[in-house]
């Protein structure tokens, strides 16, 4: 099972509720309408088909999917089962008969029930939205929209938006197509759909706990290391802080993820385990931060990444920012 694409698909499915409608509506009106419809929606079931084409390789993943507000979800196909009942998250590898378990506490609603009106407005302000007409997709009437990035006209997206519930049923973008088929809104999803009972002989590979909050001080309580909080964030505000503690093969690890910007423009990942980060002595990607701290930086593509280790904490800074901005952020974390 390809876990890279599995995690990608999970985030795409949970986080794809943004869209708009008619040509005459502005970003504020679209955001308000979408927020109203999302708040009225209590649950959803669908078959989700995700097709990726990366470097000429096409991969298709299909899942049974269910979501119930505020924080229950279910995904399943022939390879994997992922469920969360709002308190515990499980990922089960069917072929290997192995599973991981994560206890969840804190403001989980921030992850699965965010302020979509604010998110949608921000997205639409960065795209030019064209209304292409109406089409029927999978038996449901849809508005068809084309979104073209104001910064990069090559970045395009086409959406088929359900007329009744204002949710996207098909999203086409560069290299990825997401389709929701057999969609049912506001259905009664059985509680046992979100629960997991390990099959006979299933092996627990790792267990841990996850805490989420909009307050870094709250997640600080659940990790043993001092979180490196950036003093400079390129004007982006903290949206979510998440701490995880895991035990796999009798090895413990702790990770903190800080997300900044309404659209997640900046992510800072800090981790502590028994494996030090290896920084080469030289190379074109090697830079020196404040106080002689060595770091690696990758500035190819839209997403830039910077990695370094400080006080035993491995740090990855990633975002759609200029590399000089990433360096300023990193230096603001070093005392």
UniProtKB/Swiss-Prot annotation:
Q: Which residues form a coiled coil?
A: none
Per its UniProt record, what PROSITE patterns does this chain match?
Answer: PROKAR_LIPOPROTEIN (PS51257)
Matching entries from Gene3D superfamilies are given as:
Lipoprotein localisation LolA/LolB/LppX (2.50.20.10)
Protein name from the UniProt record: Uncharacterized protein MJ0687
Concerning InterPro entries, the annotation shows:
DUF4367, LolA/LolB/LppX, Put_LolA-like, Sporulation_related
One of its Pfam families is LolA_like
């Amino acid at each position: 099972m390809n876990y890279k694409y599995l995690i990608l698909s999970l985030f795409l499915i949970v986080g794809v509720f943004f869209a708009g409608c008619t040509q005459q509506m502005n970003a504020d009106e679209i955001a308000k309408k979408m927020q109203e419809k999302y708040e009225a929606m209590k649950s959803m079931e669908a078959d989700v088909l995700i097709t990726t084409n990366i470097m000429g390789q096409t991969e298709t993943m299909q899942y049974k999917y269910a979501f119930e507000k505020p924080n229950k979800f279910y995904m399943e196909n022939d390879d994997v089962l992922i469920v969360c009942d709002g308190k515990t998250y499980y990922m089960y590898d069917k072929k290997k008969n192995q599973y991981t378990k994560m206890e969840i506490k804190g403001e989980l609603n921030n992850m699965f029930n965010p302020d979509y009106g604010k998110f949608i407005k921000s997205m639409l302000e960065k795209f030019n939205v064209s209304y292409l007409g109406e089409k029927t997709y999978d038996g449901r009437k849809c508005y068809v929209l084309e979104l073209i990035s104001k910064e990069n006209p090559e970045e395009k997206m086409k959406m088929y938006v359900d007329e009744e519930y204002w949710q996207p049923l098909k999203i086409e973008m560069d290299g990825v197509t997401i389709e929701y088929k057999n969609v049912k809104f506001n259905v009664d999803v059985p509680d046992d759909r979100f629960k997991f009972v390990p099959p006979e002989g299933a092996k627990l590979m790792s267990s841990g706990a996850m805490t989420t909050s909009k307050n870094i001080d709250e997640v600080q309580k659940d990790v043993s290391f001092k979180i490196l909080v950036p003093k400079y964030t390129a004007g982006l505000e903290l949206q979510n802080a998440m701490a995880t503690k895991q035990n796999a093969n009798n090895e413990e690890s702790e990770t903190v993820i800080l997300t900044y910007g309404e659209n997640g423009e900046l992510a800072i990942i800090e981790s502590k385990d028994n494996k030090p980060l290896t920084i080469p002595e030289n190379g074109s990607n090697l830079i020196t931060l404040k106080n002689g701290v060595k770091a690696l930086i990758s500035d190819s593509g839209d997403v830039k990444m910077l990695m370094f280790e400080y006080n035993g904490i491995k740090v990855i800074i990633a975002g759609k920012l200029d590399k000089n901005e990433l360096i300023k952020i990193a230096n603001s974390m070093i005392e």
